[in-house]
Amino acid sequence: MTDLELSSEETITCAIIADTHIPDRVRELHPELVNKLISLQPRLIFHAGDISHPRVIAELEQFAPVYAVRGNRDWLFTKTLPLNRTFLLNNRRVFLTHGHLNFHQYWKDKMDNLLLGYNFERYSRRLLAFAPDANVLLFGHSHHAECRNQAGVFFMNPGSCSVAEKPDHQLSFGIIRFSPGGIVSGELVRLN
């Protein structure tokens, strides 16, 4: 089932946000994020989970329609948000997930990260197994920002726009563009 199908003669510009953790780790959306969303005027906002409180969605909806998924810390959304969503944007199949995928994968990931450290290849393999037909995979969870095209699939983890847990993490969000010709491009935007 597809949550949204959207085709346009113009490029569809979307913001992707993850791991806001409001109010369990920070009190509000980063003010620079708010200013950048005002300037960007995205057509859609994707939230890749760990929202923590429903007011975050309401605040983001001031800028564009929000499509969100439930993260491992989104207990308040158990009955209202799915774990995964799919979209068709300018003929590109998009899969949105938090990245923990399910209870079993969450604990496996915890152990792998503890013992082996973060590894993008591990995430990409698991995500592709859940969404083998996707052209675009959007995810969060690790707070590790990624923007790469690999084997014809565009991957983006916007990092966290609220919490930089490790020295190599910076606060960030993502911008992703879907051209009418089916070309997908994206960038990570650092927040100070």
Predicted features, each with a name:
Residues 1-16, 169, 174-192:
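Acidic, histidine-bearing metal-coordination/catalytic regions of metal-dependent phosphoesterases
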Residues 16-18, 44-50, 67-72, 96-97, ...:
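Active-site neighborhood of phospho(di)ester-bond hydrolases with catalytic His/Asp-centered motifs
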Residues 57-95:
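Extended active-site neighborhood of metal-dependent phosphoesterases/phosphodiesterases
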Residues 7-11, 24, 94, 99-122, ...:
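Active-site-proximal loop/helix segment associated with metal-binding centers of metalloenzymes
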Residues 3-7, 83-91, 146-150:
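Short acidic-hydrophobic surface loop/beta-edge motif
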